[in-house]
A protein has these predicted regions:
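Conserved RNase H-like, two-metal-ion catalytic cores of nucleic-acid enzymes
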Residues: 5-127
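Generic structural signal for hydrophobic core residues of well-folded globular domains
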Residues: 51, 79, 115-116, 132, ...
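A broadly conserved amphipathic alpha-helix scaffold signal in soluble, globular proteins
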Residues: 93, 126-130, 164-171
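Glycine-rich, flexible loop/turn motifs
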Residues: 102-103, 111, 133, 142, ...
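A polyampholytic, Gly/Pro-enriched intrinsically disordered region
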Residues: 123-137
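Acidic, Mg2+-coordinating catalytic module of metal-dependent nucleases/exonucleases
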Residues: 136-198
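Acidic, Ser/Thr-rich low-complexity intrinsically disordered segments
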Residues: 198-213
């Protein structure tokens, strides 16, 4: 099956292997991925979740070795659409490894939080939802078999939760970043992310090329 809508619960739509042509986005989207594990070179991409500003979630489920997704790739490469991630470094590396393209126009809420909220070391998505939005999200499906052919309703809701709050989090963080005069630093970090992801794919995750040693 190819990009047929398999399920729809609440504002969540699930497709197989690609987005359909009639799903389009403008301005900005929130994106996350789910993989078999956390090794970007060995653990395959299972899901790509996309949410628009209205909180509608579109989830693309990849059957193993079926990564020909021209509609999704076109959106990810579109420089006119801002992609909001939480920990973009991992997601864009996984997308490059599996879909063969590098995302353009990137924003990372984890980096933004580290720049804006220097008074805390709590920069996880659950922390940002709780601290900035007063929302307690459920992370019980964080370790889950995302490669299974049929996903549970709770898995789909978990996957959607990873993207539906990112627009609002970005808006909150941007206000602090602007107030503290760190906009140029944030933009420089976001622009460097594709390069950082390329280093990770080369096996340099733990190596800092800027260090003296």
């Amino acid at each position: 099956p190819h990009h047929t809508m398999a399920q729809k619960i609440k504002n969540i739509k699930l497709y197989k292997n690609d987005l359909p042509l009639n799903v389009t986005f403008k301005g900005s989207i929130a994106i996350d991925t789910e993989t078999m594990g956390l090794n970007i070179n060995n653990d395959r991409l299972c899901l790509v979740q996309i949410s628009d500003k209205e909180g509608n979630s579109h989830i693309v489920q990849f059957i193993k070795d079926c990564y020909d997704a021209p509609n999704l790739r076109k959106i990810l490469e579109d420089k006119n659409i801002l992609k909001i991630f939480h920990y973009a470094r991992f997601d864009i590396a996984v997308i490059k490894k599996n879909l063969g393209i590098m995302c353009e126009s990137i924003y990372c809420t984890k980096i933004a939080s580290k720049l804006a909220r220097t008074f805390t070391d709590r920069h996880g998505l659950k922390d940002l939802c709780k601290d900035l939005l007063k929302i307690d999200i459920n992370k019980q499906n964080q370790t889950s078999d995302w490669g299974h052919d049929s996903l549970t309703e709770s898995q789909l809701e978990y996957a959607a939760n990873d993207v539906i709050y990112l627009h609002e989090i970005k808006n909150k963080l941007d206000k602090i970043i602007k107030r503290e005069g760190k906009e140029y630093l944030a933009q420089a970090c976001f622009k460097f992310l594709p390069t950082r992801a390329e280093f990770d794919l080369l096996g340099w995750q733990e190596k800092d090329i800027f260090q003296h040693k």
